[in-house]
Design a protein with these regions (language model features):
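Phosphate-group recognition and catalysis centered on beta-loop-alpha active-site segments
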Residues: 1-339
Length: 339
């Protein structure tokens, strides 16, 4: 590789990926219920580069956008289908999922950000998220798609390719990025869509980077997940590099490592964006898109460490941090969007 091409901006340019990339994690999910129309419309109108989503499949074979394996955290499934409150998404038909309220939980969890109009928001299909991404000619975000628990959904990689192809989303380079924690799914995604950029997500624990402590959170007996992960590190340098090599061998153009958040909390994990790690990625021709940071102090630290893009629940904050042109206020936008 020539000397100039192993820096992040050059790698990103070669893949037609914005640099640094603003990846709206489940939409603008700090200000609106994750993975709903409100969150994705808000992220689009703020100017995010990508709408990030998690893909699963219904009992009747429709691709839907849900993060958790079960529906209890982000819907009223316990009231609607009490005997199936802990059933996986794949046990429900699309009609059943559409009958759930995927917004009211947010109003209860975050009263300071609650809006009456969030009640009764629905779970979305992949088609509906594509419609949102295409809905404003002035704001055209790409899609950053994770295949969730791919073992549970055999053939989801081909199904995704067929859908993206049918919607004309495989024609423009860099418009779609595919992401997975699963090396087998990475290989299958690469087989189906060799030309589409792919990211291997990294964390420390089961089925990923082996921890120096030899412990997984589940076996640690600890209560606080964030502080447990904040202390975890790869078994050694070589273990981390092995995963970079696996990403490269599987067809990835980058990795998606976790990070520690300065305020810890639910989405804080191990620090896998130390400068030497990012440098090792760049030396292998891999971009680094870190998940999931929401505060300026963490944005600054990550950029200083050499990352090429950030997954964030606060796309507006990150866009302002990058001083992108005129980022409107979230509250005003939500109002204009009818929320």
């Amino acid at each position: 590789m020539n000397a100039g091409a192993s820096d992040g901006p050059s790698l990103a340019k070669a893949q037609h990926v914005p640099h640094p990339a603003v990846i709206a994690h489940r939409g603008a999910s700090f200000d609106a219920p994750e993975s709903t129309t409100a969150a994705y419309l808000l992220a689009r109108e703020l100017g995010a580069d990508y709408l990030e989503l998690d893909l699963q499949r219904t009992l009747d074979n429709v691709l839907v956008v849900v993060h958790d394996d079960v529906l209890a955290r982000t819907s009223d499934v316990a009231e609607r289908f009490p005997e199936r409150a802990k059933s996986p998404v794949s046990d429900f038909t699309l009609a059943e999922l559409k009958s759930l309220d995927a917004g009211s939980w947010f109003n209860k969890a975050y009263p300071d950000r609650a809006r009456e109009s969030f009640a009764k928001l629905q779970i979305l299909t992949l088609d509906e998220v594509i419609d949102i991404a295409e809905g404003n000619p002035q704001r055209q975000p790409g899609l950053y798609i994770e295949t969730k628990v791919p073992k549970q959904f055999p053939g989801i990689e081909k199904q995704l390719k067929d859908k993206l192809q049918a919607r004309g989303w495989l024609d423009k380079p860099g418009r779609v990025i595919l992401q997975t924690f699963d090396r087998n799914s990475l290989a299958l995604l690469h087989q189906q869509m060799p030309q589409v950029p792919k990211i291997l997500l990294l964390w420390i624990g089961k089925d990923s980077i082996e921890p120096k402590s030899g412990k997984d959170f589940a076996d640690s007996g600890e209560k606080d997940k964030a502080s447990f992960y904040a202390r975890q590190e790869p078994k050694d340098h070589d273990e981390f590099l092995r995963w970079l090599d696996a990403a490269k061998a599987g067809g990835a153009i980058g990795t998606g490592p976790s990070a520690v958040r300065s305020k810890l909390g639910e989405q804080s994990y191990a620090d896998l964006i130390q400068p030497w790690m990012n440098q090792a990625s760049h030396e292998r021709g891999l971009l680094v898109h870190v998940y999931t940071l929401d505060d300026r102090v963490d944005f600054a630290k990550a950029m200083k460490a050499g990352v090429d893009g950030i997954f964030t629940n606060r796309a507006g904050e990150l866009l302002r941090f990058y001083a992108r042109s005129q980022v409107p206020a979230e509250a005003r936008l939500l109002k204009e969007l009818g929320y």
